[in-house]
Amino acid sequence: MNMFITVQIVIVLVLAVLSEAASLPTATERKDAMDEGPNQSDEPEGSVADPSTKDDDYSDSLKQDEKYYKVRLLNTGDKFYGLMG
């Protein structure tokens, strides 16, 4: 009797782990999300931005960050309360 219950518990746990694994994003989806992340820039690393467009670039970057994090939070099932800061 105890062995039967133990086997049932193990089966339930295995099914729970498999269903959770099936809901996770694949490696390709994670890579795509990272490629589209908030740190994307048209400028090569180490370049200096034009100071006259600094505020516009910063504002656009914040908008992209906010959109990215909203999408990431929605995809993970978390509630979005707004960006801190």
Swiss-Prot record:
GO annotation, biological process: immune system process; neuropeptide signaling pathway; vasodilation
UniProt keyword Signal present: yes
Organism superkingdom: Eukaryota
Sequence ranges of Basic and acidic residues compositional bias: 52-61
Free-text disruption phenotype from the record: Extended probing times when mosquitoes are fed on mouse or chicken but not when fed using an artificial membrane feeder. Reduced blood-feeding success, determined as the percentage of engorged mosquitoes after 90 or 120 sec, when fed on mouse or chicken but not when fed using an artificial membrane feeder. No significant effects on blood meal size, fecundity and fertility. Lower blood perfusion during probing and feeding at the bite site. Reduced endothelial permeability enhancement at the site of inoculation in the host. (Microbial infection) RNAi-mediated knockdown results in reduced ability of mosquito saliva to enhance Semliki Forest virus infection in mammalian cells.
Residues found modified as Methionine amide: 84
Residues in the signal sequence: 1-23
Keyword Signal: yes
Subcellular location: Secreted
PROSITE patterns: TACHYKININ (PS00267)
Stretches that traverse the bilayer: none
Region Disordered: start-end pairs: 26-61
Gene Ontology CC annotation, any one: extracellular region
Function per UniProt: Vasodilatory peptide. Facilitates mosquito blood feeding on vertebrate host. Induces nitric oxide (NO) release in blood vessels through the activation of the nitric oxide synthase (NOS3). Enhances endothelial permeability and induces edema at the site of inoculation in the host. Induces host smooth muscle contraction. Down-regulates production of Th1 cytokines, such as IL2 and IFN-gamma (IFNG), in mouse splenocytes. Up-regulates production of Th2 cytokines, such as IL4 and IL10, in mouse splenocytes. (Microbial infection) Promotes Semliki Forest virus infection in the host.
Homology family: Belongs to the tachykinin family.
Protein name: Prosialokinin
Species in which this protein is naturally found: Aedes aegypti (Yellowfever mosquito)
